Amino acid sequence: MKKFSCILILLFFVLFSAQVYGKERKVNFVYVSWTGVTLKTEIAKYILGKLGYTVSAKLVSVPICYMALKTKNVDIFLGNWMPVQREIYEKYKNHIVKLATNMDGAIYTLAVPKYVYEAGVKHFKDLDRHKDKFNAKIYGLEEGNMGNEVIRYMINNNLFSLKDWELVVSSEPAMLSQVKYMISQKKWVAFLGWQPHHMNIMFDMAYLDGSTKETFGENNGESIVNTIVRVDFVEEYPNVSTFLKNLKFSVDSINKMMLELYKDKSLEPKDVAVKWLNENKSLLKKWLKGVKTADGKGDAYKIVMDSFLN
């Protein structure tokens, strides 16, 4: 993992350059393979592109996101889920700036199918009582994901008697496929669940109680998602920073976009993001308040609105 991280950071060095009005106008996003963060990144990319910025986005793991922000090889990450990323955020807090909360009302914790919940598994402490039915496994996401690290912490410290359990490292699509199959067979499965996500519509599921400060937070997985940037970004990009501070999403809006992606596999996240933006142009007034084009001369709102007419 360490070697892989170093290789990615070296690659990022060729992408970064500091920019202000009148110079190169390149903005670099970093994101992870979570549908919601991907959609938000595509929307931000589209708008900034119309304003005259050259915009790129690199897909990596959560730890690499923070390392790249620290080394100033990328600029922006729209996926700082809190409190689950608290540990890595604290590690890098002197090298990043929290610009805004781009979504509240989110959830991130362990989940089970509704039939399992109704059979008595409603709390983390209920899991081990039914260890055999779960095959002592919890299905997680990609390596390096903070949710995985929380589950490992629970297992390694025997929280909720989970010392004999196994974390199954996977990916969002693979985990969802596994959960879908097991639900179709009425099997018992515990997995990382979150909202917004179309899994909440795909599956009749329930979130477990029992989360603590050391796990998914003290409010049973209730979360916020922040926009974070590298140090000095606000000073170098005041115009983009104003836009990012204004950029806010509702859980419902992300759920709707995710559901459309799920229903139509031919669509790419960019297609859905731009379509949704076209259908919700009223948000642009708020998002682009106080924002100019990249050269500092044009009306950002007018430019983006005009783009939907072409």
For each of these PLM feature ranges, what is it?
Residues 44-51, 131-165, 278:
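Ligand-binding cleft/hinge of the Venus flytrap
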Residues 41, 60-95, 178, 198-204:
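Pocket-flanking alpha-helical
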Residues 247-310:
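C-terminal functional modules
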Residues 23-36, 53-58, 135-139, 244:
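Short, well-ordered beta-strand elements
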Residues 32-35, 53-68, 166-178:
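Short helix-initiation/N-cap motifs at beta->coil->alpha
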Residues 95-147:
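A conserved helix-loop-strand patch within extracytoplasmic ligand-binding domains
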Residues 74-78, 149-213:
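Ligand-binding pocket segment of bilobal, Venus flytrap-like solute-binding proteins
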Residues 108-118, 222-236, 259-260:
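A bilobed periplasmic-binding-protein/Venus flytrap-type ligand-binding module shared by bacterial periplasmic
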